[in-house]
């Protein structure tokens, strides 16, 4: 082979959305690079070296120095190899590719990740015929944590560990984001000063759509000041909003009245006014996994405290450990009533009585491990014949049903297994009566054998331990939580990262919901808009869209404190959902729902579209129009009771239609209003005669637009 038979061709790899990097604006360029080189246009070639700034960001070269660029410094033959020489940047991945004229395709020949800066070489075995080669550069994320090796090098982190920041158990991506947020300057690992980057308004609004019931102007300003990471730190240790207390605040002592309206009133008061928004959103998400429902269940529906007490269980553990939450749910009288393991008796074959299997089935299928064995990335495991592997069978259900026998009423009325109780007594946990608990061994999930001779409570402990130790629980529940906060179709890498935190929070603890929630919200796929292209994001729940609208404009009435006159019977019909009002234990929608059309053809899911029927879309639009125009008055209440949005700020902008729409875009759609929608709203606003009508028209059109309905 002569040197002339090897033709080098240089090509740079462009940054792709979703590549491993801290990229909060979704521009495809690392925020760290942008802060090192502030104000540069990615499309420009500032130093005139023939490479635009975006390409230099990928290569890690200096966009202000025309001599700093990716180039082949030399090519020589050594034995039977062609040796390429170039100057590398620490943490960047370099690949020599060869072109195949027969197929027209390039293939990787040799790859290395630069462990040091300066001269680099790669030796490529050379064929006898002429070859065309190219040198490509890309970012590399060896530990899969969402920060690339170049960024980790700047911070002094390691690309071999996702928890190398020295900040306890915090993931490196989250630590990197916190490092960059704020004002003033920070020092990189080599002592280089770098200006910090406080989050911009649009990023904060989008984040609050994911992590709260929606931002209002004050909350948005606060998060812009303390940073997304700073707000997360505040929220992970707040005082607990207890809905029973909220209900009692509105309704007097526990037995004063149990009218179900007060549950909804209490929920709304918490969602609209409480500061611990992250915990409340997690409680709402958990209520759609560990489902009980007032729909068609008089005991639950007719007593506001029964509903609130169950919700309190979810809130109490929402940032705690899932194993503890699962235990309290298993013992809750509300769940015992709903899934019929309250007064579930031991077997008596002589009369054909066997334990009820309802709760035993659903605690596996819906609350912990699902139907099919999963890999850590959520994909199904397959047997040797390529078939999905069930996690359990009917025998397992029958054995698990034996575990959940012997429960009777607890509290003051729980004097025996057969004692009855009124509705208020349902707020007390169930009590185990061993005389009605199934004796003997129980062969349950994961080949676990619960020994004979234990108490009922010991059997339950063993069963819950087995479920929470099962490898399925991490990817199964993590996916359900991701779907409630950030996206319907998480990539395998996203789900794998979150499931890894479920399996180990950094201290060896499994099921730490606080750590899992931070992993969900502070993942690069959550913090980077459209990280997974047009498969990113989710359709927002209609009920939460209503709450977000009311919060954005601080809807209140003249009462101090405000009251929330919400009729519980109207929203399921209008929106297809209301907290604790699912039509079945399977929630309002299935996590794998695939609407007909393009989504199904592409293998994508959209759970929320299962309740998007034509009549609900029309009724929901009419209701939102009524709320915007008149306020929320489902009881046709006196004017003093009606919740009215405060439109004073947008009304002050109404003389300038473009300024008005831009303000609402930043508040409601995080700057993502499409140009066509923006122009249509401006034209509609200009056609209105008064400031009031201009604002109402603009708000209505925006909240009904895809840009508000779909979170990207």
Where in the sequence are the language-model features?
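Residue-level detector of buried hydrophobic side-chain packing
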Residues: 11, 33-34, 53, 96, ...
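Short, composition-biased motifs enriched in small/polar/acidic residues
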Residues: 19-193
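Flexible, low-complexity segments enriched for small/polar residues
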Residues: 205-212, 290, 470-474, 478-507, ...
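Bacterial N-terminal signal peptides
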Residues: 8-17
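Sec/Tat-exported extracytoplasmic proteins
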Residues: 33, 37, 55-62, 67, ...
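Active-site substrate-binding loop specific to GH73 endo-beta-N-acetylglucosaminidase modules
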Residues: 196, 220, 224-227, 236, ...
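N-terminal mature-domain "stem" immediately C-terminal to a signal peptide or N-terminal signal-anchor/transmembrane
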Residues: 193-239
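Bacterial N-terminal signal peptides that target proteins for export
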Residues: 1-7
């Amino acid at each position: 082979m002569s040197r002339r038979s090897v033709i080098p061709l240089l090509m740079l790899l462009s940054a792709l959305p979703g590549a491993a990097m801290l990229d909060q604006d979704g521009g495809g360029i690392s925020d760290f690079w942008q802060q090192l080189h502030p104000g540069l246009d990615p499309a420009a070639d500032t130093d005139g070296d023939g490479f635009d700034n975006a390409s230099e960001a990928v290569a890690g070269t200096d966009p202000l120095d025309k001599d700093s660029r990716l180039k082949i410094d030399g090519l020589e033959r050594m034995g039977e190899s062609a040796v390429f020489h170039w100057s590398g940047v620490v943490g960047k991945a370099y690949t020599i590719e060869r072109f195949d004229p027969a197929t027209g395709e390039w293939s990787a020949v040799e790859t290395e990740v630069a462990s040091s800066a300066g001269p680099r070489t790669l030796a490529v075995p050379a064929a006898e015929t002429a070859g065309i080669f190219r040198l490509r550069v890309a970012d590399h994320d060896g530990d899969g944590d969402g920060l690339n090796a170049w960024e980790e090098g700047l911070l002094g982190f390691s690309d071999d560990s996702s928890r190398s920041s020295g900040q306890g158990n915090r993931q490196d991506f989250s630590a990197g984001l916190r490092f960059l947020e704020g004002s003033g300057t920070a020092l990189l690992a080599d002592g280089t000063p770098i200006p910090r980057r406080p989050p911009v308004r649009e990023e904060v609004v989008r984040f609050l759509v994911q992590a709260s019931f929606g931002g209002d102007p004050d909350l948005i300003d606060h998060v812009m000041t303390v940073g997304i990471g700073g707000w997360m730190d505040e929220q992970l240790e707040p005082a607990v909003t207890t809905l029973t207390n909220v209900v009692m605040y509105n309704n007097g002592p526990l037995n004063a009245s149990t009218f179900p309206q007060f549950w909804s009133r209490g929920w709304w008061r918490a969602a609209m006014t409480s500061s611990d928004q992250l915990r409340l959103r997690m409680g709402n998400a958990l209520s759609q996994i560990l489902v009980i429902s007032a729909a068609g269940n008089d005991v639950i529906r007719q007593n506001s405290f029964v509903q609130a007490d169950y919700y309190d269980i979810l809130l109490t553990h929402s940032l705690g450990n899932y194993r503890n939450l699962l235990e309290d749910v298993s013992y809750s009288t509300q769940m015992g009533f709903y899934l019929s393991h309250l007064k579930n008796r031991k077997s008596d074959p002589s009369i054909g009585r066997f334990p009820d299997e309802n709760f035993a089935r659903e605690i596996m299928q819906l609350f912990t491990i699902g139907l099919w064995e999963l890999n850590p990335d959520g994909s199904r495991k397959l047997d040797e014949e390529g078939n999905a592997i069930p996690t359990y069978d009917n025998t397992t259900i029958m054995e698990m049903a034996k575990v959940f026998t012997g429960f009777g009423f607890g509290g003051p009325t729980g004097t025996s297994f057969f004692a009855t109780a009124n509705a208020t007594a349902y707020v007390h946990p169930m009590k185990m009566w061993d005389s009605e608990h199934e004796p003997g061994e129980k062969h349950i999930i994961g080949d676990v054998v619960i020994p004979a001779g234990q108490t009922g409570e010991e059997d339950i402990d063993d069963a819950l331990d087995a479920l929470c130790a099962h490898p399925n629980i991490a990817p199964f529940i993590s996916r359900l939580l991701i779907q409630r906060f950030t996206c319907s179709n998480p990539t395998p890498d996203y789900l794998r990262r979150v499931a890894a935190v479920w399996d180990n929070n950094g201290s060896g603890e499994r099921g730490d919901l606080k750590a899992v929630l931070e992993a969900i919200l502070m993942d690069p796929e959550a913090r980077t808009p459209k990280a997974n292209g047009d498969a990113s994001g989710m359709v927002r729940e209609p009920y939460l869209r209503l709450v977000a609208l009311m919060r954005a404009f601080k809807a209140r009435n003249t009462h101090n404190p405000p009251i929330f006159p919400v009729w519980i019977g109207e929203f399921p019909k209008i929106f297809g959902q209301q907290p604790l009002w699912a039509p079945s234990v399977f929630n309002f929608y299935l996590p794998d729902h695939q609407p007909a059309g393009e989504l199904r053809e592409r293998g994508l899911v959209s759970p929320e579209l299962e309740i998007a029927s034509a009549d609900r879309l029309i009724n929901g639009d009419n209701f939102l129009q009524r709320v915007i125009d008149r306020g929320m008055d489902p009881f046709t209440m006196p004017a003093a009771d009606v919740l009215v949005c405060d439109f004073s700020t947008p009304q002050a902008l109404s003389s300038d239609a473009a300024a008005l729409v831009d303000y609402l875009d930043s508040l409601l759609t995080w700057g993502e209003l499409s140009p066509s929608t923006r122009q249509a709203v401006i034209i509609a606003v200009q056609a209105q005669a008064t400031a009031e009508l201009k604002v109402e028209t603009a708000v209505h059109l925006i909240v009904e637009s895809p840009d508000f309905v779909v979170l990207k």
